[in-house]
């Protein structure tokens, strides 16, 4: 997967530049000499968020999807009523399809995030989606689901019993897998194929990698990796997982990275041993940087940890969705991390402008200053 992520774009994809090259000084000069200034391909306003459509139907109008269980699903045509149990799905669906009223049901946790996110400004139709058919652990109430008259339902690939009971009720189910950029690309391709927008999938995926390549080029000469700790909840940290991807590209080391899991129990003695220089608090928890910086947590003394002493504690942002898991805004997560960890390489990069340009390119949406502050304002220490 690493080779795929680090691939170079052809001159055709680099013919137009939407975002300014990141970096400054010698690092920026080196990046420019390696032609990184042409690394971000443009998605035109006419294309974003809806690109030219491509006919994916057979002669009888059937659309064929192969899901991440290797199962073939045949749809009678572009579905008018789509339902998902998967939390990040709505904003990825929106990035591919644009404004629509096709998504009629989603996970209640998706709506919790939606109400805190920029997606509520871009995709107001989602507010009316039903959440009565599923709980936060992805267990489906088939009777409630049937009331939604879904053409297709998206469910996690490991929820075997849930998939079976829906299929037994005559409901078509597409299974998706979580965890990697390859998986994310497959989601985008499946959604695009299903909705008759295959060209849009390529645009999004190419633009994603162009932004990641931009950071890679700016950090090419940087050998100092930041020592960062990822807090997923009180006295819980993230070990191995998707975070390894964005830490690799932003050049940071997680001292808990050899441990397996995303919610590992720890104690303060372990934190003192690791002594991280930067701490990131996940967006799925209610913890805030002030809880550590002001030593508010009972029985825990964070004041002696380098990250706290130096004020380097940050909250992971929520944009269209939380930036923690794989998503279309993962390149923004990487840029945000890289600027914090290596400020000398990104001295001239304005993160507000990066987010603004990204939203215009991907969603064809103009963020206001107030919206930008909602995305980034509370993430700083």
For each of these PLM feature ranges, what is it?
Residues 240-263:
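Alpha-helical, coiled-coil/dimerization segments enriched in small aliphatic residues
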Residues 37-67, 71-76:
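N-terminal low-complexity, Pro/Thr/Ser-rich intrinsically disordered segments
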Residues 21-33, 40:
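Bacterial lipoprotein signal-peptidase II cleavage site
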Residues 58-65, 72-74, 161-236, 256-258, ...:
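Extracytoplasmic substrate-binding proteins
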Residues 12-21:
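Bacterial N-terminal signal peptides
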Residues 131-137, 141-155, 171, 267-284:
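Proline-aspartate-enriched helix->loop->beta-strand connector
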Residues 86, 90-144, 152-154:
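A short, structured surface patch at a secondary-structure boundary
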Residues 2-13:
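Bacterial N-terminal signal peptides that target proteins for export
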């Amino acid at each position: 997967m690493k080779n795929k992520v680090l691939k170079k774009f052809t001159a055709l994809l680099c013919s137009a530049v939407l975002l300014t090259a990141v970096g400054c000084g010698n690092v920026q000069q080196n990046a420019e000499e390696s032609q990184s200034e042409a690394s971000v391909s443009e998605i035109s306003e006419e294309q974003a968020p809806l690109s030219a459509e491509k006919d994916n139907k057979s002669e009888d109008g059937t659309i064929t999807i192969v899901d991440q269980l290797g199962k073939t699903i045949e749809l009678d045509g572009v579905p008018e009523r789509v339902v998902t149990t998967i939390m990040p799905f709505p904003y990825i669906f929106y990035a591919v399809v644009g404004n629509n009223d096709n998504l009629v049901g989603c996970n209640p946790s998706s709506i919790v995030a939606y109400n805190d996110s920029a997606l509520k400004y871009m995709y107001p139709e989602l507010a009316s989606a039903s959440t009565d058919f599923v709980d936060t652990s992805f267990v489906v109430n088939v009777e409630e689901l049937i009331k939604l008259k879904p053409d297709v339902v998206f469910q996690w690939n490991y929820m075997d019993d849930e998939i079976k009971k829906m299929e037994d009720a005559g409901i078509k189910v597409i299974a998706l897998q979580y965890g990697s950029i390859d998986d994310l690309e497959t989601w985008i391709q499946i959604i695009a194929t299903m909705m008759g927008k295959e060209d849009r999938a390529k645009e999004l995926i190419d633009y994603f990698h162009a932004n990641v390549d931009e950071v890679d080029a700016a950090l090419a000469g940087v050998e100092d990796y930041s020592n960062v700790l990822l807090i997923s909840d009180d006295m819980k940290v993230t070990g191995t997982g998707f975070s390894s991807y964005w830490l690799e590209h932003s050049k940071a080391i997680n001292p808990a990275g050899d441990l397996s899991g995303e919610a590992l129990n720890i104690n303060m003695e372990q934190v003192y041993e690791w002594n991280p220089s930067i701490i990131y608090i996940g967006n799925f928890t209610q913890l805030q940087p002030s809880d550590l910086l002001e030593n508010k947590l009972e029985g825990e003394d964070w004041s002696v940890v380098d990250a706290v002493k130096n004020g380097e504690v940050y909250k992971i942002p929520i944009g269209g969705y939380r930036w923690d898991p794989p998503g279309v805004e993962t390149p923004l997560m990487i840029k945000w991390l890289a600027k914090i960890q290596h400020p000398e390489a990104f001295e001239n990069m304005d993160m507000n402008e990066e987010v603004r340009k990204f939203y215009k390119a991907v969603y064809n949406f103009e963020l206001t200053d107030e919206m930008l502050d909602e995305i980034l304002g509370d993430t700083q220490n």
